[in-house]
């Protein structure tokens, strides 16, 4: 919980700086932060180096500058990550990145979601569904599609913290409960 509060504060601080830096800066900083987070996710050893309290902040910052140079991070993002290194908070960067993405989505009026179906949908059908959902919500929707044969049929839509389960499996479970209760 404490890590989440700390990560939220850092994400809000970077987002506030990005808004002051210009119209395109929030999205650019977000891409840089996500790129750095994906490097850390792909290299657990690097994350261990940043999480190790025995390694000095200077060593962490030199490793950070090497990584930043290879992936081409913006100077403000490098400064932000250096601050995290000074405060021994670099292990929080994955959480900071996710929270920053949430702040950016809210500012841009974007919702993220996942649509689960029993079988793969054609690209044209995916586009139709996305357009229809965007019309209903009035917001831009970034939708990922997944396949789960266990739902038997129908769809399960997850957007934010809401879940709409219109799967055949869920309907069968409801029917089963009604039969048990004698309805």
From Swiss-Prot:
Record-level Gene Ontology MF annotations: proton-transporting ATP synthase activity, rotational mechanism
Gene Ontology CC annotations of this record: plasma membrane; proton-transporting ATP synthase complex
Record membrane topology: Peripheral membrane protein
PROSITE patterns per UniProt: ATPASE_DELTA
Compartments where found: Cell inner membrane
Keywords, comma-separated and alphabetical: ATP synthesis, Cell inner membrane, Cell membrane, CF(1), Hydrogen ion transport, Ion transport, Membrane, Transport
HAMAP family, per the entry: ATP_synth_delta_bact (MF_01416)
PANTHER family: ATP SYNTHASE DELTA CHAIN
Family in the record: Belongs to the ATPase delta chain family.
Quaternary structure and interacting proteins, as annotated: F-type ATPases have 2 components, F(1) - the catalytic core - and F(0) - the membrane proton channel. F(1) has five subunits: alpha(3), beta(3), gamma(1), delta(1), epsilon(1). F(0) has three main subunits: a(1), b(2) and c(10-14). The alpha and beta chains form an alternating ring which encloses part of the gamma chain. F(1) is attached to F(0) by a central stalk formed by the gamma and epsilon chains, while a peripheral stalk is formed by the delta and b chains.
Role of this protein: F(1)F(0) ATP synthase produces ATP from ADP in the presence of a proton or sodium gradient. F-type ATPases consist of two structural domains, F(1) containing the extramembraneous catalytic core and F(0) containing the membrane proton channel, linked together by a central stalk and a peripheral stalk. During catalysis, ATP synthesis in the catalytic domain of F(1) is coupled via a rotary mechanism of the central stalk subunits to proton translocation.
Protein name: ATP synthase subunit delta
Organism: Solidesulfovibrio magneticus (strain ATCC 700980 / DSM 13731 / RS-1) (Desulfovibrio magneticus)
